A protein has these predicted regions:
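Conserved catalytic cores of phosphodiester-cleaving nucleases, focusing on short active-site segments
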Residues: 39-60, 75
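Positively charged, solvent-exposed patches that mediate nucleic-acid binding
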Residues: 44-45, 90, 108-111
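Short, low-complexity, polybasic intrinsically disordered segments
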Residues: 99-112
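Short acidic/glycine-enriched loop/turn segments that link adjacent beta-strands
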Residues: 34-38
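Catalytic cores of nucleic-acid endonucleases
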Residues: 56-102
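Acidic-basic catalytic patches of nuclease active cores, encompassing PD-(D/E)XK
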Residues: 1-30
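Hydrophobic "anchor" residues on beta-strands that sit immediately upstream
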Residues: 26, 49-51, 91
Length: 112
């Protein structure tokens, strides 16, 4: 990943966090890492933990296509690790925030 991609990712996550706060989410953690992968944002709303993947681009393609089964499996393993590490067993869902040209699309409870 180049430096520009890295900073674009941070910018996208910043925008996603602001969006989530306005929607009433409580932000728990950003960039949770494990040996299995990374969760961009962990947030909570209405008693449910939300593990949120953020995709940001200014290019002309469908960014949701960048989340495939391989990436989703890494996210699921990282969620399991998060639950074990923190000793919790709360209900959760996986969400996707796509940001393209400053337009935010929030896809809740995604699955493949």
């Amino acid at each position: 990943m180049g430096l520009k991609s890295y900073f674009d990712g941070i910018l996208g996550e910043d925008k996603a966090c602001e969006f989530l706060k306005k929607q009433g989410f409580k932000l728990i953690k950003r960039n949770f890492h494990s040996q299995f992968g990374e969760i961009d944002i962990i947030a909570k709303k209405d008693g449910i933990l939300h593990f949120i993947e953020v995709k940001y681009t200014q290019k002309d393609y469908e960014i949701s296509e960048r989340l495939d089964n391989k990436k989703l499996n890494k996210i699921l393993k990282t969620i399991d690790f998060y639950h074990l590490k923190n000793g919790i067993s709360e209900d959760f869902q996986i969400d996707l925030i796509c940001i393209k040209n400053d337009k935010i699309q929030f896809c809740e409870n995604i699955s493949f």
